[in-house]
Amino acid sequence: MSAPRTCYGIIPARYASSRFPGKPLAEILGRPMFWHVYDRARRCAAFDEVALATDDARIADAANVLGVPCVMTAEHHPSGTDRVHEAAMRLGVPDDAVVVNIQGDEPALDPRMLDQLVAPFADASVRVATLAMALSAQEAQSPDRVKVVVAANGDALYFSRADIPFVRDGDVGGDTAGRLGHIGLYAFRMEALRRFTQLPPSRLEQTEKLEQLRLLENGIAIRVVPTTYRTHGVDRPEDIDVIINLLRENDG
């Protein structure tokens, strides 16, 4: 009898994309993008199972050919997190297990980031975790770069597109604010993932367009893990060349 599984990695992969239709199937070094994400994720020793979650038969067929476990989900979901929840339900994930939402457009993801992300769950009180990295004052000016401020216990106080914390007197003698940029990788206890999908979109979530604020507004703490690793997502077709170079550098 096999040991019970306690940590699942789920990769949401939608075919539809306004900026890059069919992105999960984009070829990178002879393989579709989703395969590279799966290959990186399965190198994380914490996972008992890694699976793709898709609404598209073309992606599912390609996954089957390559031997990538795949779960078919409904076509329409409010967010990738909702798709991950449906896949976790179909996989029969127990309430106390950890589910990691692995972005499907991160083919150069460093598996060590995933190890860091799931480490806090050794503490039974942790329900949700995410990652953050140091930001310069210049990087923090962009509203596309989400910032997070963290309490002394390591839990998130707030996420914002604004430059937080605001340094009233300016960064005299250098960047002294200790700004942190949020990395959009999340790990949930299954019960917290279910709770998230049951909650309606919150006021601050709709204002900032940041779904993690739904958790904070409803009293669900998010543990923030600092990392020195950076992500390199694919938003547009022209990003593929950058990823190819990164993969060749890292794996060559």
From Swiss-Prot:
It catalyses: 3-deoxy-alpha-D-manno-oct-2-ulosonate + CTP = CMP-3-deoxy-beta-D-manno-octulosonate + diphosphate. GO terms for biological process: CMP-keto-3-deoxy-D-manno-octulosonic acid biosynthetic process; lipopolysaccharide biosynthetic process. Pathway: Nucleotide-sugar biosynthesis; CMP-3-deoxy-D-manno-octulosonate biosynthesis; CMP-3-deoxy-D-manno-octulosonate from 3-deoxy-D-manno-octulosonate and CTP: step 1/1; Bacterial outer membrane biogenesis; lipopolysaccharide biosynthesis. It is found in: Cytoplasm. Its EC number is 2.7.7.38. Keywords: Cytoplasm, Lipopolysaccharide biosynthesis, Nucleotidyltransferase, Transferase. Coiled coil: none annotated. GO terms for molecular function: 3-deoxy-manno-octulosonate cytidylyltransferase activity. It holds the Pfam family CTP_transf_3. InterPro entries: Cytidylyl_trans, KdsB, Nucleotide-diphossugar_trans. GO terms for cellular component: cytosol. Belongs to the KdsB family. NCBIfam families: kdsB, PRK05450.1-3, PRK05450.1-5, PRK13368.1. Activates KDO (a required 8-carbon sugar) for incorporation into bacterial lipopolysaccharide in Gram-negative bacteria. This is 3-deoxy-manno-octulosonate cytidylyltransferase.
